[in-house]
Amino acid sequence: MNYQIELRHLYYFKVLAEELHFRKAADRLFISQPGLSRQIKQMEGIYKTVLFDRSKRSVHLTEAGKYLMQEVELLFSQLNNIQTQIEKIAEGKVTSLRLGFIGSAVQTILPQLLASLKHKQPLIDITLNELSNETQLEMLSRNELDFGFVRIDTAPPNIKSLPILTEHFALVIPKNHPLKSKRNLELTDFKDEPFILFSKAYSISYYDLVMSIFRDQDFIPNVTLRTVNALSIFNLVSQGLGVAIVPSSLKNGYNTDVDFIELEHIHQRTTLTLAWNHENRNPGIPALLEVINQLL
């Protein structure tokens, strides 16, 4: 008998690949363990390859299984997107967009973009999530986000990008810092201070860029605290726990007890970038791109 791959096969495979345990996967699927085994063997027969390495103690994906899992995750993500878009259309809404962003996007273009987009398409449904750069890129690759506002040097092959804003850096110090009254402050004036920085989890390339600033100033910073949140950095600085370097735009929109010293003389610049997956067929993507190109 000739079998063909059906959606249920792929869903059974996905659950087993997540659990890597036949009994647990069968329980999630509300089927018997032998029934699940038959479905997986049927898939392996259709694909003419082994998808799982099985032993008495463990279950692991083969290389073919790992590849299939990547594709299956994208497939089910797209199916979820289709369902969401159909539901929005049924509600009378044009479409929905899922936007990821880092904090500095809120202080620059994001509010204006949302206002313009809502003006053009009042019924569009928008979900916002503040996320790290790395998380946004991962979610864009899986079609779990439609757009991301990130700070990156390079993007994966399936991700397109559009530079939005290039800016210099600023030094953040407590309002009561003893050097505050000194004229013509330089970064090297703070070389003995503890530094609070965005961590590598925020963006590896951004972290490396900031560290290059210190190298150019001929000192290694004493980095005592790292975080992925701008407000956390400002609160820590205001408590006298250190000083920080951030994109200059972050001086706007936060009510914090800190001062900003512009580092315009430093050649390093950081760019806020709009990123999206060129394989994503969400009908709202062209609408947002049209609006943002009008704003730039």
What are these regions (language model features)?
Residues 33-34, 81-138, 201, 247, ...:
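N-terminal winged-helix
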Residues 91, 161-195, 283-286:
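Flexible hinge/capping segments at coil-to-helix
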Residues 109, 259-296:
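A late-sequence structural motif
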